[in-house]
Amino acid sequence: MQEHFGSYAEYVTRSSFGQVMTVITNHEAQLGIIPCDNHEMNLKPWWSGFSSTGEGLKIIAKLPFLKRKENPLTESDVYVVALTHPAQSGDDVSLLGIEVNNDVSVSTIVEALENAGYRNPKIQLMAKVDDENKSYLAEVDGFLKPNDDGLKPLRAQFNNINIVGSYARPIEL
């Protein structure tokens, strides 16, 4: 992370998203870093604590921002979390937290997102909520503003759906 924030940036490690969230919401840190992969921190749906409207945590970036095609495995992708709304870049990806019953398939979610007009939906993470429900973190192309009209028809299909944040699409060199 030092190559993205500079060698003088101070950082501390936390073992759970709850700890990261507490440090940020208590203003002990300005940014949090959450792994994008199946890291043990992602066994619980941390994204369900994000609100589509109002103040609160949002994903504002994805790192690394510059990716080299010849060496794609240099570091793992991470989301940057902060107590601010993301800025629109013109080439963005938005993240949605979607909670459904266990019997709802990934293909059903992707199809519902496409039918609502969202482009290029991809499921990034899945975590069990309880014995009857699961939660997905999905990416769609474009910058979504709070209370995006496309979410209205989806609210009837899913137990819950909210905008978790947006980030500028990383550049491949």
Enumerate the language-model features and the residues they cover:
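Domain-level signature for soluble enzymes in the chorismate/prephenate branch of the shikimate pathway
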Residues: 1-173
